Protein backbone atom coordinates (compact mmCIF):
# COMPACT_ATOMS: atom_id res chain seq x y z
CA UNK A 1 0.00 0.00 0.00
CA UNK A 2 1.41 3.41 -1.00
CA UNK A 3 1.77 6.31 1.44
CA UNK A 4 -1.10 8.08 -0.34
CA UNK A 5 -3.43 5.08 -0.01
CA UNK A 6 -2.54 4.54 3.65
CA UNK A 7 -3.08 8.24 4.47
CA UNK A 8 -6.43 8.27 2.67
CA UNK A 9 -7.54 5.05 4.41
CA UNK A 10 -6.71 6.49 7.85
CA UNK A 11 -8.63 9.66 7.00
CA UNK A 12 -11.62 7.63 5.83
CA UNK A 13 -11.65 5.53 9.02
CA UNK A 14 -11.44 8.65 11.18
CA UNK A 15 -14.35 10.25 9.33
CA UNK A 16 -16.55 7.17 9.46
CA UNK A 17 -16.38 7.11 13.26
CA UNK A 18 -19.31 9.53 13.17
CA UNK A 19 -21.28 6.46 12.12
CA UNK A 20 -20.04 4.66 15.24
CA UNK A 21 -21.33 7.54 17.36
CA UNK A 22 -24.66 7.36 15.59
CA UNK A 23 -24.91 3.60 16.14
CA UNK A 24 -24.09 4.03 19.84
CA UNK A 25 -26.73 6.73 20.26
CA UNK A 26 -29.36 4.59 18.55
CA UNK A 27 -28.43 1.37 20.37
CA UNK A 28 -28.24 2.61 23.96
CA UNK A 29 -30.50 4.88 25.97
CA UNK A 30 -27.82 6.54 28.10
CA UNK A 31 -24.31 7.77 27.37
CA UNK A 32 -21.53 7.11 29.89
CA UNK A 33 -20.61 10.77 30.17
CA UNK A 34 -17.72 10.34 32.63
CA UNK A 35 -15.95 7.90 30.31
CA UNK A 36 -16.62 10.20 27.35
CA UNK A 37 -15.20 13.18 29.28
CA UNK A 38 -12.06 11.24 30.18
CA UNK A 39 -11.65 10.03 26.59
CA UNK A 40 -12.06 13.51 25.09
CA UNK A 41 -9.54 14.94 27.56
CA UNK A 42 -7.18 12.08 26.67
CA UNK A 43 -7.54 12.91 22.96
CA UNK A 44 -6.81 16.58 23.63
CA UNK A 45 -3.66 15.65 25.55
CA UNK A 46 -2.39 13.50 22.70
CA UNK A 47 -3.10 16.13 20.05
CA UNK A 48 -1.57 19.01 22.02
CA UNK A 49 1.58 17.07 22.92
CA UNK A 50 2.18 15.66 19.45
CA UNK A 51 1.57 19.08 17.87
CA UNK A 52 4.16 20.89 19.98
CA UNK A 53 6.70 18.11 20.49
CA UNK A 54 6.63 16.25 17.17
CA UNK A 55 4.91 18.05 14.29
CA UNK A 56 6.23 21.60 14.81
CA UNK A 57 9.87 20.43 15.18
CA UNK A 58 9.44 18.38 11.96
CA UNK A 59 8.04 21.47 10.25
CA UNK A 60 10.93 23.67 11.40
CA UNK A 61 13.46 21.06 10.30
CA UNK A 62 11.92 20.84 6.81
CA UNK A 63 11.72 24.62 6.45
CA UNK A 64 15.22 25.26 7.81
CA UNK A 65 16.68 22.95 5.14
CA UNK A 66 15.74 25.49 2.47
CA UNK A 67 16.04 28.60 4.65
CA UNK A 68 18.09 29.66 7.64
CA UNK A 69 17.12 28.22 11.02
CA UNK A 70 15.65 31.56 12.10
CA UNK A 71 13.69 32.05 8.88
CA UNK A 72 12.40 28.47 9.10
CA UNK A 73 11.20 29.09 12.65
CA UNK A 74 9.41 32.26 11.54
CA UNK A 75 7.65 30.55 8.62
CA UNK A 76 6.69 27.60 10.84
CA UNK A 77 5.24 29.92 13.50
CA UNK A 78 3.25 31.95 10.97
CA UNK A 79 1.95 28.73 9.37
CA UNK A 80 0.95 27.40 12.80
CA UNK A 81 -1.23 30.42 13.53
CA UNK A 82 -2.45 30.34 9.93
CA UNK A 83 -3.81 26.83 10.57
CA UNK A 84 -5.59 28.08 13.68
CA UNK A 85 -7.00 31.05 11.77
CA UNK A 86 -8.20 28.77 8.96
CA UNK A 87 -10.11 26.55 11.40
CA UNK A 88 -11.52 29.60 13.22
CA UNK A 89 -12.75 31.02 9.90
CA UNK A 90 -14.57 27.76 9.12
CA UNK A 91 -16.11 27.92 12.61
CA UNK A 92 -17.49 31.38 11.81
CA UNK A 93 -19.25 30.06 8.69
CA UNK A 94 -21.68 28.07 10.86
CA UNK A 95 -24.36 29.80 13.00
CA UNK A 96 -23.92 29.06 16.71
CA UNK A 97 -27.19 27.09 16.94
CA UNK A 98 -26.02 24.54 14.36
CA UNK A 99 -22.32 24.70 15.26
CA UNK A 100 -21.23 21.43 16.91
CA UNK A 101 -18.78 23.45 19.04
CA UNK A 102 -21.64 25.54 20.46
CA UNK A 103 -24.50 23.05 20.76
CA UNK A 104 -25.71 21.62 24.03
CA UNK A 105 -24.37 18.27 25.15
CA UNK A 106 -26.16 15.01 24.47
CA UNK A 107 -28.44 13.72 27.17
CA UNK A 108 -30.54 10.57 27.67
CA UNK A 109 -32.79 9.53 24.82
CA UNK A 110 -36.10 10.67 26.27
CA UNK A 111 -39.20 12.16 24.59
CA UNK A 112 -38.38 15.40 22.81
CA UNK A 113 -40.13 18.56 23.94
CA UNK A 114 -39.57 20.43 20.68
CA UNK A 115 -41.54 19.81 17.54
CA UNK A 116 -40.48 17.10 15.10
CA UNK A 117 -39.93 19.73 12.42
CA UNK A 118 -37.53 21.72 14.59
CA UNK A 119 -35.67 18.57 15.65
CA UNK A 120 -35.35 17.42 12.07
CA UNK A 121 -34.02 20.84 11.02
CA UNK A 122 -31.53 20.80 13.89
CA UNK A 123 -30.27 17.35 12.88
CA UNK A 124 -29.87 18.34 9.23
CA UNK A 125 -28.00 21.54 10.03
CA UNK A 126 -25.84 19.79 12.61
CA UNK A 127 -24.87 17.20 9.98
CA UNK A 128 -23.98 20.01 7.54
CA UNK A 129 -22.00 21.87 10.21
CA UNK A 130 -20.04 18.75 11.15
CA UNK A 131 -19.33 18.07 7.48
CA UNK A 132 -17.85 21.58 7.14
CA UNK A 133 -15.76 21.14 10.29
CA UNK A 134 -14.51 17.75 9.07
CA UNK A 135 -12.77 19.36 6.08
CA UNK A 136 -9.74 20.73 7.98
CA UNK A 137 -9.71 17.68 10.26
CA UNK A 138 -9.43 15.44 7.21
CA UNK A 139 -6.52 17.51 5.94
CA UNK A 140 -4.83 17.26 9.35
CA UNK A 141 -5.06 13.46 9.41
CA UNK A 142 -4.10 13.01 5.76
CA UNK A 143 -1.01 15.22 5.65
CA UNK A 144 0.24 13.95 9.01
CA UNK A 145 -0.07 10.36 7.75
CA UNK A 146 1.54 11.31 4.44
CA UNK A 147 4.55 12.63 6.37
CA UNK A 148 4.72 9.83 8.97
CA UNK A 149 2.35 6.84 9.04
CA UNK A 150 2.83 6.13 12.76
CA UNK A 151 1.99 9.75 13.54
CA UNK A 152 -0.99 9.53 11.19
CA UNK A 153 -2.37 6.51 13.08
CA UNK A 154 -2.18 8.41 16.37
CA UNK A 155 -3.89 11.51 14.98
CA UNK A 156 -6.53 9.49 13.10
CA UNK A 157 -7.37 7.65 16.33
CA UNK A 158 -7.81 10.86 18.33
CA UNK A 159 -9.90 12.51 15.60
CA UNK A 160 -12.01 9.34 15.36
CA UNK A 161 -12.66 9.42 19.10
CA UNK A 162 -13.84 13.02 19.04
CA UNK A 163 -16.05 12.31 15.99
CA UNK A 164 -18.11 9.82 18.02
CA UNK A 165 -20.09 12.42 20.04
CA UNK A 166 -20.56 14.45 16.85
CA UNK A 167 -22.21 11.39 15.28
CA UNK A 168 -24.49 11.18 18.30
CA UNK A 169 -25.38 14.87 17.93
CA UNK A 170 -26.61 14.24 14.38
CA UNK A 171 -28.42 10.96 15.03
CA UNK A 172 -30.45 11.82 18.14
CA UNK A 173 -32.55 14.73 16.76
CA UNK A 174 -33.02 13.03 13.38
CA UNK A 175 -34.23 9.83 15.05
CA UNK A 176 -36.71 11.61 17.31
CA UNK A 177 -38.03 13.67 14.41
CA UNK A 178 -38.41 10.84 11.87
CA UNK A 179 -38.47 7.69 14.06
CA UNK A 180 -36.17 6.24 11.39
CA UNK A 181 -32.93 4.71 12.63
CA UNK A 182 -31.82 4.20 9.04
CA UNK A 183 -32.16 7.91 8.16
CA UNK A 184 -30.47 9.00 11.40
CA UNK A 185 -27.53 6.67 10.81
CA UNK A 186 -27.24 7.56 7.11
CA UNK A 187 -27.00 11.31 7.69
CA UNK A 188 -24.44 10.85 10.44
CA UNK A 189 -22.43 8.48 8.26
CA UNK A 190 -22.49 10.89 5.30
CA UNK A 191 -21.34 13.86 7.41
CA UNK A 192 -18.20 11.88 8.22
CA UNK A 193 -17.35 11.43 4.54
CA UNK A 194 -16.42 15.12 4.42
CA UNK A 195 -13.20 14.15 6.19
CA UNK A 196 -11.66 12.10 3.33
CA UNK A 197 -13.17 14.61 0.90
CA UNK A 198 -11.29 17.42 2.66
CA UNK A 199 -8.11 15.35 2.42
CA UNK A 200 -8.56 14.81 -1.32
CA UNK A 201 -9.35 18.48 -1.98
CA UNK A 202 -6.31 19.60 0.01
CA UNK A 203 -4.04 17.08 -1.69
CA UNK A 204 -5.34 17.94 -5.18
CA UNK A 205 -4.74 21.66 -4.63
CA UNK A 206 -1.29 21.24 -3.08
CA UNK A 207 0.06 18.25 -5.04
CA UNK A 208 1.75 20.28 -7.81
CA UNK A 209 3.59 22.30 -5.14
CA UNK A 210 4.26 19.55 -2.56
CA UNK A 211 8.00 20.13 -2.07
CA UNK A 212 9.69 19.57 1.35
CA UNK A 213 9.35 23.34 1.92
CA UNK A 214 5.59 23.29 1.26
CA UNK A 215 5.22 20.13 3.36
CA UNK A 216 6.89 22.00 6.23
CA UNK A 217 4.29 24.77 5.93
CA UNK A 218 1.48 22.20 5.75
CA UNK A 219 2.73 20.36 8.85
CA UNK A 220 2.87 23.59 10.88
CA UNK A 221 -0.64 24.48 9.68
CA UNK A 222 -1.85 20.99 10.63
CA UNK A 223 -0.48 21.45 14.14
CA UNK A 224 -2.37 24.75 14.37
CA UNK A 225 -5.58 23.01 13.28
CA UNK A 226 -5.07 20.29 15.89
CA UNK A 227 -4.37 22.75 18.72
CA UNK A 228 -7.48 24.75 17.79
CA UNK A 229 -9.63 21.60 17.78
CA UNK A 230 -8.22 20.57 21.16
CA UNK A 231 -8.80 23.94 22.82
CA UNK A 232 -12.08 24.87 21.13
CA UNK A 233 -13.80 21.48 21.03
CA UNK A 234 -12.20 18.58 22.88
CA UNK A 235 -11.45 20.19 26.25
CA UNK A 236 -14.71 22.21 26.52
CA UNK A 237 -16.70 19.10 25.55
CA UNK A 238 -14.81 16.98 28.09
CA UNK A 239 -15.65 19.45 30.86
CA UNK A 240 -19.33 19.68 29.86
CA UNK A 241 -19.74 15.91 29.68
CA UNK A 242 -18.00 15.29 32.97
CA UNK A 243 -16.12 17.60 35.33
CA UNK A 244 -13.03 19.78 35.27
CA UNK A 245 -10.66 17.44 37.12
CA UNK A 246 -11.76 14.44 35.05
CA UNK A 247 -11.03 16.34 31.83
CA UNK A 248 -7.60 17.44 33.13
CA UNK A 249 -6.82 13.87 34.25
CA UNK A 250 -7.55 12.67 30.72
CA UNK A 251 -5.46 15.52 29.29
CA UNK A 252 -2.40 14.67 31.38
CA UNK A 253 -2.81 10.94 30.72
CA UNK A 254 -2.97 11.59 26.98
CA UNK A 255 0.19 13.67 27.09
CA UNK A 256 2.00 11.04 29.16
CA UNK A 257 1.01 8.19 26.84
CA UNK A 258 2.05 10.21 23.77
CA UNK A 259 5.37 11.19 25.36
CA UNK A 260 6.13 7.58 26.29
CA UNK A 261 5.24 6.30 22.83
CA UNK A 262 7.49 8.91 21.16
CA UNK A 263 10.37 8.00 23.49
CA UNK A 264 9.95 4.30 22.69
CA UNK A 265 9.79 4.95 18.94
CA UNK A 266 12.99 7.04 18.85
From Swiss-Prot:
Membrane topology field: Multi-pass membrane protein
Binding residues annotated for Zn(2+), in chain numbering: 137, 162, 166
Residue spans crossing the bilayer: 8-28, 36-56, 71-91, 123-143, 152-172, 185-205, 209-229, 246-266
Major place of residence: membrane
GO cellular component, one term: plasma membrane
Pfam families: Zip
GO molecular function: metal ion binding; zinc ion transmembrane transporter activity
Catalytic reactions of this protein: Zn(2+)(in) = Zn(2+)(out)
Subcellular location: Cell inner membrane
Record key words, sorted: Cell inner membrane, Cell membrane, Ion transport, Iron, Membrane, Metal-binding, Transmembrane, Transmembrane helix, Transport, Zinc, Zinc transport
Top-rank lineage group of the source organism: Bacteria
Binding-site list for Fe(2+): 134, 137, 163, 166, 195
InterPro entries attached to this UniProt entry: ZIP (IPR003689), Zn_transptr_ZupT (IPR023498)
HAMAP family linked: ZupT
Purpose of the protein: Mediates zinc uptake. May also transport other divalent cations.
Family the UniProt entry places it in: Belongs to the ZIP transporter (TC 2.A.5) family. ZupT subfamily.
Protein's name in the database: Zinc transporter ZupT
Lineage per the UniProt record: Bacteria, Pseudomonadati, Chlorobiota, Chlorobiia, Chlorobiales
Designated gene of the protein: zupT
